[in-house]
């Protein structure tokens, strides 16, 4: 009897573990403040100016054993740009930068994921300011597992660098401020 019980427990554990590693779809948990899309740009070459987008939605497919099957899709409300300075945010929403009246959303949709040791390169099409260009996000799995509410989560961080002029942003901020760095932290809830 004990052998059968131990065998059943071992089989159940193996199936449970295998189930955790299989491909799954995740919804980005922005409601619990477990996801952030932030950016930084040099200010005159002396310091960093940080900002974020407060309103976005997204999902991803994660298959730890087959990263090439992974997918990411995110939509950002560009009007939600926030640098903690109302006048600057108003200027960022204008035609000089994001032109939110004409381009109320920015989107990213992956086209390829390549594993690179303990990280991955997520390449996809970013549409920002009405311009679509390929962008590669350097991403890393931070962790995954069961949450206290009966769900399963996976968390990642990532970064990418964008040239403002590539996305039709012609405002000249000086030689030190031609690029903006995206800083991403995402926690997804398995669906």
UniProtKB/Swiss-Prot annotation:
Q: Where in the cell is it found?
A: Periplasm
UniProt cross-references to InterPro entries, sorted A to Z: Lipid/polyisoprenoid-bd_YceI (IPR007372), TTHA0802/YceI-like_sf (IPR036761), UPF0312/YceI (IPR023480)
Cleavable signal peptide: 1-23
Q: Which SUPFAM superfamilies match?
A: YceI-like
Which keywords label this protein? Answer: Periplasm, Signal
Report the record's disulfide bonds.
Answer: none
Name of one Pfam family that matches: YceI
Q: Which GO terms describe its cellular component?
A: periplasmic space
NCBIfam families xrefs: PRK03757.1
> What family does this belong to?
Belongs to the UPF0312 family. Type 1 subfamily.
This chain's protein is named UPF0312 protein PSPA7_0523
